[in-house]
């Protein structure tokens, strides 16, 4: 199929860009339909049910996916579980893995002269192949939720996927996934 052909032949930059755009449009349109079902028809995603089997407290839960869509994010938030995707902010969220881990603090407890941070229940979501909301703005990775599907940061199949995986934010997501 397509993946094998792209592994055997290096496509031009223009072809790769079109593949990314078409892939993002296809998945994005399907994702939009699912989101409508969640909002208007109370659709519960399978991952929402799956989350109920975990006791997500201070340490949270690590989830690693190669999917570009945001269905895991929707499932988590529908269950009241926050999502750490290593970006900080809400509308133009910057890629900031160091700062993102503190964004979920709920309390600072002092006991016996020692301080300990408490965190809201969260899922740390690692996407080593990218996400539909990821964009490069002024040379830096951002997560923009209401984005067009023109130039998303997603790694599609092909020879170049290994090279692309060493760029940010993919590299950090991959490295954290390897240690999770």
Q: Where are the regions that the model predicts?
A:
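Gly/serine-rich nucleotide phosphate-binding loop at the start of the catalytic core
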Residues: 1-76, 81-83
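Active-site gating loop/helix substructures
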Residues: 23-40, 75, 79-179
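A short acidic-Thr-Gly-centered motif at the start of a beta-strand
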Residues: 47-58, 115-118, 176-180
């Amino acid at each position: 199929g397509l993946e094998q052909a792209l592994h055997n032949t290096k496509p031009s930059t223009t072809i790769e860009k079109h593949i990314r755009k078409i892939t993002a449009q296809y998945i994005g349109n399907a994702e939009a339909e699912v989101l409508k079902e969640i909002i208007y028809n109370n659709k519960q995603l399978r991952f929402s049910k799956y989350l109920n089997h975990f006791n997500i407290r201070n340490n949270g839960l690590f989830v690693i996916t190669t999917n570009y869509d945001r269905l895991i994010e929707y499932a988590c938030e529908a269950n009241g579980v926050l999502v750490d995707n290593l970006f900080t902010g809400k509308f133009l969220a910057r890629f900031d893995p160091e700062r993102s881990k503190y964004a979920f603090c709920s309390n600072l407890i002092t006991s016996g002269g020692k301080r300990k941070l408490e965190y809201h229940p969260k899922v740390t979501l690692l996407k080593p192949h990218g996400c539909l909301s990821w964009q490069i703005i002024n040379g830096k990775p951002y997560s923009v939720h209401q984005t067009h599907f023109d130039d998303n940061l997603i790694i599609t199949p092909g020879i170049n996927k290994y090279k692309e995986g060493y760029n940010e934010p993919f590299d950090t997501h991959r490295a954290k996934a390897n240690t999770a």
